[in-house]
Swiss-Prot record:
GO biological process, one term: UDP-N-acetylglucosamine biosynthetic process
The protein's name: Phosphoglucosamine mutase
PTM comment: Activated by phosphorylation.
Obligatory cofactor(s): Mg(2+)
The record's free-text note on cofactor binding: Binds 1 Mg(2+) ion per subunit.
Record family assignment: Belongs to the phosphohexose mutase family.
InterPro entries (alphabetical): A-D-PHexomutase_a/b/a-I, A-D-PHexomutase_a/b/a-I/II/III, A-D-PHexomutase_a/b/a-II, A-D-PHexomutase_a/b/a-III, A-D-PHexomutase_C, A-D-PHexomutase_C_sf, A-D-PHexomutase_CS, Alpha-D-phosphohexomutase_SF
GO cellular component: cytosol
Catalyses which reaction(s): alpha-D-glucosamine 1-phosphate = D-glucosamine 6-phosphate
Keywords: Isomerase, Magnesium, Metal-binding, Phosphoprotein
Binding, Mg(2+): S100, D241, D243, D245
Length: 446
């Protein structure tokens, strides 16, 4: 059982879970662990636009410099940009201060190794051990303390990186694009990238004030984007989340396109171009069965993992896949990036749109998603999933669905909630089986 790290770094309420004291210790512990050899060591630190980012950034700088690491400060930058710059700047470690799609009150600390990948469970466990040790005995001597420096050219570096993921013969000339940056980390780089590639860009969610990240904007709240696309008769809307590692698209009719549909478009395109390194893609247990059937019709498989982009990426790396993602919009393209990158994923979709010279609505809706119902059951103490009545209800629900659907029962990794999801060809049956399982869980949790 891990004490500090969850499935996506350390995350919680700022000045509640994520305190200056904890951030200081994380900096010291990670700094000690990633010092190898006698040369000067350095860490890059990026953040999103939350008010608490200043506090956490300052505490991390104190932690890293106190154990002799030099710090390169990037300011507000997307998570995938931090991962890319960690590699590009030959840093020993990368840090992103963000709570992704959560409200401004929360914040988090994500760590990347020198290769730009998120740290393994084993390395995170070792950092936890060091956090709880006597770090005062391992501080650097006065003459060996680290320095901190703010880097000014990082936006241009990431913009050039993102542009290079587009084939050289493809431009975005003639496209009217609305991009929603969620008042988050991509508020500068995303509109600039799209404009430099030739698009007419209308940007919303680009006025961060420390409090408005993800508030009624971004990939988890796309209504504002839908309205703007319809109002301006745009060709496409692109919604990023607070740290820009996920994306949701809106077509010219205002219809939403989720991560499953985006993966379907890219998978088909890459199969035709013989770019897939394996005959399939990697997704999670939450991806729609319609995606699996669509890929099967193309001769491609869908491998499922636990929920979380880190598990998708782990399977991709272990088994040689170069495309994977989540329904929520984390799209991982390992030819380009070591983590989900919302802007790069959107550019790959736009590549297909420009090549085919068809509207986004015709390119994107590759399959009809099966009816899917998701409900959450909150519980107190105990383990309701172990109760006989719940086990019986789950078994009965799966038997009723048979081969015409799926049932997924998943405890949340961040709160005392059990998620019940079912999908199938018959919507009425899907609703019934979810309600039966939810009722059994509520009685068991009472």
């Amino acid at each position: 059982m891990r004490k500090y790290f969850g499935t996506d770094g350390i995350r919680g309420r700022a000045n509640g879970v994520i305190t200056p004291e904890l951030a200081l210790k994380v900096g010291q512990a990670a700094g000690l662990l990633f010092q190898r050899g006698e040369y000067r060591h350095r860490v890059v630190i990026g953040k999103d636009t939350r008010l608490s980012g200043y506090m956490i950034e300052t505490a991390l700088v104190a932690g890293f410099t106190s154990v002799g690491m030099d710090v390169l400060l990037l300011g507000p930058m997307p998570t995938p940009a931090v991962a890319m710059l960690t590699r590009s700047m030959r840093a020993d470690l990368g840090v992103m201060i963000s709570a992704s799609h959560n409200p401004y009150e929360d914040n988090g600390i994500k760590l990347f190794g020198p290769d730009g990948f998120k740290l393994s469970d084993e390395v995170e466990h070792e950092i936890e051990r060091l956090i709880d040790s006597d770090l005062q005995k391992r501080l650097s001597a006065s003459a060996d303390l680290g320095r901190a420096k703010r880097i000014e050219s990082v936006h241009a570096r990431y913009i050039e990186f993102a542009k290079r993921t587009l084939p050289r013969n493809i431009t975005l000339d003639g496209l009217r694009v609305v991009v929603d940056c969620a008042n988050g980390a991509a508020y500068r780089v995303a509109p600039e990238t799209l404009w430099e590639l030739g698009a007419e860009v209308i940007a919303i969610g680009t006025e961060p004030d420390g409090f408005n990240i993800n508030r009624d904007v971004g990939s988890t709240a796309p209504d504002a984007l839908v309205r703007k696309v319809r109002e301006l008769r745009a060709d496409i809307g692109i919604a990023l989340d607070g740290d820009a590692d996920r994306v949701l698209v809106v077509d010219e009719k205002g219809q939403r396109v989720d991560g499953d549909q985006l993966m379907a478009v890219v998978a088909r395109s890459w199969k035709e171009d013989e770019r897939l390194t394996q005959p399939g893609i990697v997704a999670t247990i939450m991806s729609n069965l319609g995606l699996e059937r669509y890929l099967g019709g193309l001769g491609l498989s869908l491998v499922r993992t636990a929920v979380g982009d880190r598990y998708v990426l782990e399977h991709m790396r272990e088994h040689g896949y170069n495309l994977g993602g989540e329904q929520s919009g984390h799209i991982i393209m390992s030819d380009y990036a070591t983590t989900g990158d919302g802007l790069v994923a959107a550019l790959q979709l736009l590549t297909v749109v420009q090549r085919q010279k068809r509207p986004v609505s015709e390119v994107c809706h590759c399959f009809d998603p099966l009816p899917q119902v998701l409900k959450n059951v909150r519980y107190g103490a105990g383990e309701p999933l172990r109760k006989d009545s719940v086990v019986t209800a789950i078994e009965g629900a799966r038997q009723r669905l048979g081969n015409a659907g799926r049932l997924v029962i998943r405890p949340s990794g961040t709160e005392p909630v059990i998620r019940v999801m079912a999908e199938g060809d018959d919507r009425d049956l899907v609703v019934e089986v979810v309600d039966e399982v939810v009722e059994a869980l509520r009685k068991a949790a009472a």
